[in-house]
Amino acid sequence: MATSTETISSLAQPFVHLENPINSPLVKETIRPRNDTTITPPPTQWSYLCHPRVKEVQDEVDGYFLENWKFPSFKAVRTFLDAKFSEVTCLYFPLALDDRIHFACRLLTVLFLIDDVLEHMSFADGEAYNNRLIPISRGDVLPDRTKPEEFILYDLWESMRAHDAELANEVLEPTFVFMRAQTDRARLSIHELGHYLEYREKDVGKALLSALMRFSMGLRLSADELQDMKALEANCAKQLSVVNDIYSYDKEEEASRTGHKEGAFLCSAVKVLAEESKLGIPATKRVLWSMTREWETVHDEIVAEKIASPDGCSEAAKAYMKGLEYQMSGNEQWSKTTRRYN
């Protein structure tokens, strides 16, 4: 009889395994994108990179969630495996320490799964759901062990704090900001791109991704250095949000027609700009693609200025800025290949 591990591995085999070179682990584009194939993004000067442990971590983390999360059907299992949440984490944080990347994969995976749950809830129900999880994440309240979202979050945060309490605790509040943004009623009344980008900086979890990257890389920046990164992070949030919105638009537009009228409400840069500019959806996506490349140029310019400044730049700050670049390039690579959007 097969062991549970072998059963999980067999179930996951068609969807999760990647081949990657030992020295340069780049993710293969094994999925032909079906989302807006007539729209070609402008060329980018950046290259993506993937964490070298992507295959083993993906198998480990997917196996954990297959064993512990209550998926309602095999179709839901397949959808989960196709999404490759650990892969996107390894693309976001390719420079993460080997003994920390699995923490980041588990956290982003459970947050993605919770986000899917919220699509079928009203804002009030979603807010109550998240408010229950926040004190559990802090360790102030013990979880109900019959509810996967509760014990998974509790055990994960406890293990992260045991590994590095200082940097783990820096991830907590940004995570809560992200969770609150998911049920923010403001998303129902956003009609201007600038307003949308301000909201999306919280909803895309930019502060969460930044803090989680510092945890996963073991980076300790001074308070002054963190403050000095605000403009760079805000620029990064715009690029991340819009690239994600371009690729996820078709999936989210469909969800808005089939999910809860609040939880699945379509709030996207594509929709906002199309309505504001009176352009069609394909034209709006082309305009947004040009904007993303301009934000990449802005990132490079800010980084060059910081490195050339008379005050200099610490090695930790340089690593952090390079990490932000990899977040953006990695997000684009995952967004254009994941079956979650394509």
From Swiss-Prot:
Binding site for Mg(2+) 1: D115
Domain of life from the UniProt record: Eukaryota
Annotated metabolic or biological route of this protein: Sesquiterpene biosynthesis; aristolochene biosynthesis; aristolochene from farnesyl diphosphate: step 1/1
Residues binding Mg(2+) 2: D115
Outcome following mutation: S248A: Abolishes catalytic activity
Keyword Nucleus: no
UniProt GO MF annotations: aristolochene synthase activity; metal ion binding
Coiled coil: none
Annotated signal sequence range: none
Catalytic activity: (2E,6E)-farnesyl diphosphate = (+)-aristolochene + diphosphate
The keyword Metal-binding is assigned to this record: yes
Phenotype upon loss of function: Reduces the production of PR-toxin and leads to a large increase in mycophenolic acid production.
Cross-referenced InterPro entries: Isoprenoid_synthase_dom_sf, Terpene_cyclase-like_2
Site (Important for catalytic activity): Y92, F112, F178, W334
Keywords, alphabetical: Lyase, Magnesium, Metal-binding
Details of cofactor binding: Binds 3 Mg(2+) ions per subunit.
Effect of E252D: Abolishes catalytic activity
Binding positions for Mg(2+) 3 per the UniProt entry: N244, S248, E252
PANTHER family reported for this sequence: BETA-PINACENE SYNTHASE-RELATED (PTHR35201:SF4), TERPENE SYNTHASE (PTHR35201)
Function: Aristolochene synthase; part of the gene cluster that mediates the biosynthesis of PR-toxin, a bicyclic sesquiterpene belonging to the eremophilane class and acting as a mycotoxin. The first step of the pathway is catalyzed by the aristolochene synthase which performs the cyclization of trans,trans-farnesyl diphosphate (FPP) to the bicyclic sesquiterpene aristolochene. Following the formation of aristolochene, the non-oxygenated aristolochene is converted to the trioxygenated intermediate eremofortin B, via 7-epi-neopetasone.
Description of how the protein assembles with itself and partners: Homodimer.
Annotated family: Belongs to the terpene synthase family.
Protein name (database record): Aristolochene synthase
Biological source species: Penicillium roqueforti
